Amino acid sequence: MYSIVAEESGLLPRERLLQKGAEVLSDQELLAIVLRTGTRSESVLSMANRILKGMTSLADLSRLSLNELQEIPGIGRVKSIELKAMVELAKRIEKAELARSEQIMSSQQVARRMMLDIGDKPQEHLVAIYLDTQNRIIQQKTVFIGGVRRSIAEPREILYYACHLMATSLIVVHNHPSGEAYPSRNDIDFTQKIKRSCDDLGICLLDHLIVGKSTYYSFREEREDFEL
């Protein structure tokens, strides 16, 4: 269960933010500021406390749909929309921070980016990230949505865009809607096939990443020779 640390200073969250800064506020206080008001029978701090206690971690808030948010007692249509907008804005800020890096330096860097993009999608998304000679992103393209199985026999679409964009290397990423990131036999077969196709064209497959909601698997990191 989510752990709540009580603040006993007597100051309201907005007053504490003004006096001490947002970084010192607890999750409960920050959520109370976003919620703005409670109900006739419950203060906004108490409501924030109750919402957070019903979660295993703060990340759970980002996974709730509008309907699920509205099912929380005290959270109506307006508050659910505001919360959803806040979560989406936080995601976009994180993406913008990651995008500031001019070069892809590690698989972990890409995994963080893609967990935000597709980690919680209900369908499998197959994404190709095309890079130049400096490992800068030329383009990120969603190649397929639905199931990776059909894509296993069709690496040509991935490589078509690589040639069209004059990419020297690429990274392939797909998500597991289950949230788990361990590769299946199909994932391994697909990686072998796309790697061979890349080698034939002189394009470097830097990695194949599988992402879940909060975890990832890197074929390059987990398989030292990346020969499979």
From Swiss-Prot:
A motif (JAMM motif) lies at residues 174-187. SUPFAM superfamilies: JAB1/MPN domain, RuvA domain 2-like. One of its GO terms (molecular function) is metallopeptidase activity. Residues 103-225 form the MPN domain. Gene3D superfamilies: Cytidine Deaminase, domain 2 (3.40.140.10). The keyword Aminoacyl-tRNA synthetase does not apply. Zn(2+) binds at H174, H176, D187. The keyword Zinc applies. GO terms for biological process: proteolysis. InterPro entries: MPN, RadC_JAB, RuvA_2-like, UPF0758, UPF0758_CS, UPF0758_N. Keywords: Hydrolase, Metal-binding, Metalloprotease, Protease, Zinc. NCBIfam families: PRK00024.1 (NF000642), radc (TIGR00608). Belongs to the UPF0758 family. This is UPF0758 protein stu1465.
